């Protein structure tokens, strides 16, 4: 009872905090005079991280196993993974800011986890025999970390497509340039370096607006780096799952719906990484492939759980009428 109460408190603290954080972040982004509020949003993200971490530890102690046995627990872990991604640029002392993607993703993920749809999964239960393995933590954690990473990379690619094809709205007008500078931290040194690179390289596309060009180049670079990391984690997760499947079911691969869609996900992002090596496909075409991958990930992760079919139906849930 104590652990259940603690988990309830920590979950709602983290959700409330992240809701405040995204409000502060958007106001600081749109209103120049409130730029100092970014420090407050970062403190809020830290508080959210410790709340989610506390929940995972409490759940682990109360259930006796790592909390990855159902959709509710996996969504909380996914929120935790998104925060880890949020901190990567700061650890590297990078000027790039992924919070525009990671913060809304965290609040949406945790908002769904704490909604009434998953109430029946809030209580920890004993693992079914097939899940009582040391591979549970390794396989599922790798898969969820890869999902979080690939989702962020796909959203960055989707942003590239939106920027390149959204011509009816002049987002890059003079009054909005300060937003771009604050969000992506342009500097004079970067300007002259990019300008020099622009004239040296014939492969760089020509944009009527320099800020549009610089922004899409930044997003494309970050998308490639994030998706490369996610693809590596996905590969490790699939290999761990194959070994576990052989121990549990006597076969490395059964073409279960979850396995099939995991393979499709892996193939889509393999195509993306391969397309990056071709100059004719690099840019808009590769971003389109990654954007398709965003939908494939949600089908693989959420859609199969919603259907509750196949060998991976342990964490599924059914929508019950009120």
Swiss-Prot record:
Gene Ontology molecular functions: heme binding
Pfam families assigned to the protein according to its UniProt record, in alphabetical order: Cytochrom_C_asm
Compartment(s): Plastid, Chloroplast thylakoid membrane
GO biological process, one term: cytochrome complex assembly
A cellular-component GO term for this protein: chloroplast thylakoid membrane
Keyword Ribosomal protein: no
Residue ranges that the Swiss-Prot or TrEMBL entry lists as coiled coil: none
Transmembrane stretches, start-end: 2-22, 44-64, 68-88, 143-163, 226-246, 260-274, 289-309
Entry keywords, A to Z: Chloroplast, Cytochrome c-type biogenesis, Membrane, Plastid, Thylakoid, Transmembrane, Transmembrane helix
Primary location group: plastid
Membrane protein topology class: Multi-pass membrane protein
NCBIfam families xrefs: cytochr_II_ccsB (TIGR03144)
Function: Required during biogenesis of c-type cytochromes (cytochrome c6 and cytochrome f) at the step of heme attachment.
Family that this chain belongs to: Belongs to the CcmF/CycK/Ccl1/NrfE/CcsA family.
Subunit structure: May interact with Ccs1.
Protein name stated in the entry: Cytochrome c biogenesis protein CcsA
Organism (species): Brachypodium distachyon
């Amino acid at each position: 009872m104590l652990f259940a109460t603690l988990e309830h408190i920590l979950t709602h603290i983290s959700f409330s905090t992240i809701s405040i954080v995204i409000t502060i972040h958007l106001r600081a982004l749109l209103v120049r005079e409130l730029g100092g509020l970014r420090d407050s949003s970062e403190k809020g993200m830290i508080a959210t991280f410790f709340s989610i971490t506390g929940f995972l530890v409490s759940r682990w102690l109360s259930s006796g196993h790592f909390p990855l046995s159902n959709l509710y627990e996996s969504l909380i872990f996914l929120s935790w993974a998104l925060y880890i991604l949020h901190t990567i640029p700061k650890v590297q002392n990078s000027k790039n800011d992924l919070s525009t993607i990671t913060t809304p993703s965290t609040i949406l993920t945790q908002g769904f986890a704490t909604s009434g749809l998953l109430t029946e999964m809030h209580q920890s239960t004993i693992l079914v025999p097939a899940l009582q393995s040391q591979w549970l933590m390794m396989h599922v954690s790798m898969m969820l970390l890869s999902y979080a990473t690939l989702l962020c990379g796909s959203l960055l690619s989707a942003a590239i497509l939106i920027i390149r094809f959204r011509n009816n709205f002049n987002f890059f007008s003079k009054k909005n340039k300060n937003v771009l500078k604050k969000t992506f931290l342009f500097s004079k040194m970067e300007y002259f370096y990019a300008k020099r690179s622009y004239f040296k390289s014939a492969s760089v596309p020509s944009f009527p607006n320099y800020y549009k060009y610089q922004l899409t180049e930044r997003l494309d670079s970050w998308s490639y780096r994030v998706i490369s990391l996610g693809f590596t984690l996905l590969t490790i997760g699939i290999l761990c799952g194959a070994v576990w499947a052989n121990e549990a079911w006597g076969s490395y691969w059964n073409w279960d719906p979850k396995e099939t869609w995991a393979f499709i996900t892996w193939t889509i992002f393999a195509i993306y990484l391969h397309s990056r090596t071709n100059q004719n496909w690099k840019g808009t075409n590769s971003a389109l492939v990654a954007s398709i991958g965003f939908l494939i990930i949600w089908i693989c992760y959420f859609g199969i759980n919603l259907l509750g079919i196949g060998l991976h139906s342990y964490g599924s849930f059914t929508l019950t009428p009120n």
